[in-house]
Each structure stands twice: as C-alpha cells, then as structure tokens.
C-alpha cells in the first residue's frame, strides 16, 4: 500500500482537530470546577455562523459557559450552540468549525489558555455547515 503525502496530511489534520476538541472539553471542565467562564477566540470565515456585528478585525470572542449557551454540542469538526447577544430576545444558532478556534481559556485567566493556528475550512465542511441542515458524521459530545 502506498501512502501519499495528502493522506498523511489528512490524517494529521483529523488528529489535530480531534485534539482541539479534547482541549476545549478540558478547559470547559476546568472552568466548571473552578467557577470560571470558558471563552473561545474565533478567526471568522464563511463557514462560521456568528453574529457579524460582533466580529472585529475578523475575530469574535464567544462565552461557551453552560449558563451562557443552550444546547452546546461538539464533534471532531465543529461546535454549535444557541445564544442571545446584546438586547436580543431571540437566540441565534452559533456554529464554529474547530479549525477556526485560535484560543480557548477561562475569561478570568485568558493568558493561561491554549492557543492554536487557524487553518482553512475544507470545502466539504464548508458545504456541510452552510447547507440547509447541520448534521455531524460522528456522535456529538453533549455537556
């Protein structure tokens, strides 16, 4: 069997995103144990479903604490939840590919979080997230 560079790169990217999900889960658990609020810093692209009025210089910071969001779900490709912003009474569905998350930390200790490099969203994931329904391939981790 011949392994191409592309196959190795795909496998590495899959592991990298999986590691990101594990780190995000760990930070959320740490924050819950210490009564902190977990935040993510997102480098927004067209696959991100976020309120654009809060995006500054291509970035948005989101509170992912259980008290701030409803229905938090995460798989190896993206996370999603519902949240309200500003004075809005209706909640908005937020969807963020994991490859666009550049930092995760407790709001109270932002410099002690974990940082990542943003990578381009794959065409397949972009199509999945911008289509009419968002359906993950793997079982969701629900907190």
Where are the predicted features?
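Eukaryotic intrinsically disordered, low-complexity regulatory linkers and tails enriched in Ser/Thr/Pro
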Residues: 1-143
């Amino acid at each position: 069997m011949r392994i191409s560079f592309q196959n190795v790169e795909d496998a590495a990217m899959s592991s990298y995103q999986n590691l990101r999900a594990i780190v995000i889960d760990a930070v959320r658990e740490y924050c819950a144990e210490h009564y902190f609020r977990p935040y993510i810093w997102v480098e927004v692209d067209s696959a991100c479903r976020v309120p654009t009025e809060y995006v500054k210089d291509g970035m948005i910071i989101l509170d992912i604490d259980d008290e701030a969001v409803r229905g938090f779900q995460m798989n190896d490709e993206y996370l999603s939840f519902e949240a309200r912003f500003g004075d809005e009474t209706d909640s908005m569905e937020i969807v963020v590919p994991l490859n666009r998350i550049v930092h995760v930390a407790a709001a109270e200790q932002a410099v002690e979080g974990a940082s990542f490099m943003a990578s381009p969203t794959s065409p397949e994931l972009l199509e999945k997230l911008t289509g009419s329904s968002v359906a993950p391939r793997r079982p969701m981790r629900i907190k």
